[in-house]
Amino acid sequence: MNGEADCPTDLEMAAPKGQDRWSQEDMLTLLECMKNNLPSNDSSKFKTTESHMDWEKVAFKDFSGDMCKLKWVEISNEVRKFRTLTELILDAQEHVKNPYKGKKLKKHPDFPKKPLTPYFRFFMEKRAKYAKLHPEMSNLDLTKILSKKYKELPEKKKMKYIQDFQREKQEFERNLARFREDHPDLIQNAKKSDIPEKPKTPQQLWYTHEKKVYLKVRPDATTKEVKDSLGKQWSQLSDKKRLKWIHKALEQRKEYEEIMRDYIQKHPELNISEEGITKSTLTKAERQLKDKFDGRPTKPPPNSYSLYCAELMANMKDVPSTERMVLCSQQWKLLSQKEKDAYHKKCDQKKKDYEVELLRFLESLPEEEQQRVLGEEKMLNINKKQTTSPASKKPSQEGGKGGSEKPKRPVSAMFIFSEEKRRQLQEERPELSESELTRLLARMWNDLSEKKKAKYKAREAALKAQSERKPGGEREDRGKLPESPKRAEEIWQQSVIGDYLARFKNDRVKALKAMEMTWNNMEKKEKLMWIKKAAEDQKRYERELSEMRAPPAATNSSKKMKFQGEPKKPPMNGYQKFSQELLSNGELNHLPLKERMVEIGSRWQRISQSQKEHYKKLAEEQQRQYKVHLDLWVKSLSPQDRAAYKEYISNKRKNMTKLRGPNPKSSRTTLQSKSESEEDDDEEDDDDDDEEEEEDDENGDSSEDGGDSSESSSEDESEDGDENEDDDDDEDDDEDDDEDEDNESEGSSSSSSSSGDSSDSDSN
């Protein structure tokens, strides 16, 4: 290991400190000769290599080997020696060329001596006297005493030392200016780079200002004293005062960017990225403070559950933080669906208000700041994302990832076992941490008999087989097990835990023990209700598990395509027009989807026949306008887009036929349209459009004449509703597809009720 000798050798002690015969050129020649005589694989510490050096081979001109060795010792004392001799010589060459570069400039014999500070003048004057008075004291103790004495000096006596310091300081500055004139080459070497100084942070600007103020009052204060005095003041500043320095820092940042861009144009060889120039000097907290004072609105909770928790936690300051989320979750589960929907509506309203306020805030900002805020808020796709409560979350990434999505690894038998038993163990042994709980579950799994393990392995095999069957584009999160069934005691505990925690002052362990005792002392009649609920939960679990094992139902795999400029499809009949009107005006937004469709059906039954005819005429008029607009739009398409549109319509018909079953009337229409297209190729596009409209008309007629059949009214209405919502709200296609399926199944009750009504009216 390379290392510096602990003590100098006799040769080093005897080395002369100045040899006038050696010029800079001679010293560089000496180092070059030494370099040429070094071994090729020099990896020893420098002293070892130096001891094996043949100095007679290094000798040159009139300089003998011994003279070269002495000069080398003198030079090597000026450089760091924790290296090999090869590295040392390179450093020595640099030192010979620039002996006073950087911090070594002050070692130059002509460099003026810096004046002593007022305190050091006092210290040097009194030290000898105090050392005689207290010979037993160490230098450190003497320094402490003299420092204290200096602080206790009256200002009049201190002024004597300060004036002497200022007088010598002026003289030093004059001598320094003279030194710079006499040695311009040294000053050039010591000069710092001309790259513009980086901008300071708000705290640095404040500290520099406060330091100047502090030194005016106490010019003799040390750097440590200044830091100690100002250290904690920044964090105690009011927001208003801190904003002042934030604005100054931003102004300085802007000036720096302009200067730096000019500098880069003059020095293109510098590799400085734009990111390095525009890097912010504000912390996240400072940026948020500035935005808040500029009028940026506070972001609302992402969903109804978070909103509920935020409101509940405001009144739970006395509850330990570890218990708050548990209580919130339990209280949320006890809410009725109507109460949850109210929170959902409230959350949606807060989001809408927030978006309006944020857009107003963005308008007041310059373009660069707008981009920053948009990036932070992730608002570039804000209209495509709808946050829902935990109870109504749906996978929104089914079609987005496509074939590039990495398949999810099926859960193992041990994982299935752990998920079933974890909740029970958490309640029985709440003192265990998550890691301890996992280790305990692993031991329990190992202790299970093979017969019991076989049950979980069968579930694992079923999940694995299902994962392999699933096509790549339609992967769902089916690997997750349904929520484990709860025991009767668990369901009862969830309903009463709030009361018990309040009784035992949020001591969960005591509350659980008390609940356990109460449950054990309860009569069977009292437990019966909870036992029934547990049985229902068990059935639910088995049903969901069997659904998960079953192969996925065949669905329409064709992705809904969007064509730019395509006219919006209007309602097919009076009932759909009536439904669209009620859904778009927001009158039924407070109801869940199923209840909305039921309410629409009942309202349709209650309106008069003349009103129904009015809606029917409106739908027919919109259909006529739609045909004209669609015809013009199709003719305006390029040949490639037209072909793609035709293919999409054709596939859509095929899929709808598969879902609805055979329809002789539509099949005759299709055959007829095919024969027409074969006879006249020039009118192929128009025929296709007419064919589509004929089919739409037939569907509309059948839904009106037949009384809004379950398939036509619910399916077409939901499809049209989705297309309108898609254009208005710009939602994801996956959400539209999900809603289509919901409406198809859920609209049957309303449509069937309306069918009776319309058929009655026709008969009348």
From Swiss-Prot:
DNA-binding region range list: 112-180, 196-264, 298-362, 407-475, 482-549, 568-634
GO BP, sorted A to Z: cellular response to leukemia inhibitory factor; positive regulation of transcription by RNA polymerase I; transcription by RNA polymerase I; transcription elongation by RNA polymerase I; transcription initiation at RNA polymerase I promoter
Entry annotated with the keyword Lipoprotein: no
Record's keyword terms, sorted: Acetylation, Activator, DNA-binding, Nucleus, Phosphoprotein, Repeat, Transcription, Transcription regulation
Domain of life, source organism: Eukaryota
Amino acid composition bias (Basic and acidic residues), ranges on this chain: 370-379, 457-488
Post-translational modification Phosphothreonine, affected residues: T201
Subcellular location: Nucleus, Nucleolus
GO molecular function, one term: scaffold protein binding
Biased composition (Acidic residues): 677-745
Post-translational modification: Phosphorylated and activated by PIK3CA.
PANTHER family documented for this protein: NUCLEOLAR TRANSCRIPTION FACTOR 1, UPSTREAM BINDING TRANSCRIPTION FACTOR
Protein name: Nucleolar transcription factor 1
Gene: Ubtf
